[in-house]
Regions:
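An N-terminal assembly and electron-transfer interface module characteristic of large anaerobic redox
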Residues: 1-191
């Protein structure tokens, strides 16, 4: 998730968020999930397209990464179209921004928590339940564009978040497996 108007103002921000998204998709795949990665929903039109894409893909669960600020009008259409349960991933790339050298673009790359209250409220008002996983992104390196240390893979906040994500992946797999099962049952018969 991100805000389309940022891309021309802050070079590299869009690509950086897409990189984080691909990292998440790859890691969820490693946990056993089949991932349908749309990319960035950054405006209402993209939100509708994303909702149609996820709905057509018949997903069991939506992990929505709050990469930077995004307005709820861009994200709400996704979940109005695709009714799969949503888990907002409020995963910060770093534990601490290097404020002494940061820029607005750098700050926005670490502003993932900003839209979470707005999104939660919009979902609530629309009758859409959501869950939130808070923590750190869990990269094992720092991208070249970053002005701060993003190597957080071993930090407890990342380990805990990825444990929770893994539990959601397993739960979705169980639901998918059981929804395809057909059971026959013959109770006590009387002769």
């Amino acid at each position: 998730m991100g805000l389309k108007t940022y891309w021309s103002q802050f070079p590299g921000l869009r690509e950086r968020l897409l990189y984080y998204g691909q990292f998440l998709a790859d890691k969820i795949t490693q946990l056993g999930g089949e991932v349908f990665y749309y990319g960035l929903a950054d405006c209402e039109e993209a939100g509708r397209e994303c909702g149609e894409y996820l709905n057509a893909s018949n997903v069991d669960l939506i992990f929505a990464h709050s990469g930077t600020y995004v307005n709820s009008a861009s994200i709400l259409p996704i979940h109005q179209i695709c009714k799969a349960p949503v888990v907002i991933l409020n995963l910060q790339p770093t534990a601490r921004i290097a404020y002494d050298r940061t820029t607005t673009g750098e700050w926005l790359a670490h502003c993932g928590a900003c839209p979470v209250p707005e999104l939660s409220n919009a979902f609530h008002r629309s009758g859409i339940s959501c869950r939130i996983i808070n923590g750190l992104l869990g990269l094992d390196h720092t991208p070249a564009i970053s002005l701060t240390d993003e190597n957080t893979a071993q930090r407890p906040e990342a380990v805990k978040a990825w444990k929770e994500i893994g539990e959601w992946v397993k739960a979705a797999a169980v639901k998918r497996e059981l929804s395809g099962c057909r059971f026959g049952f013959l109770g006590n018969t009387y002769n």
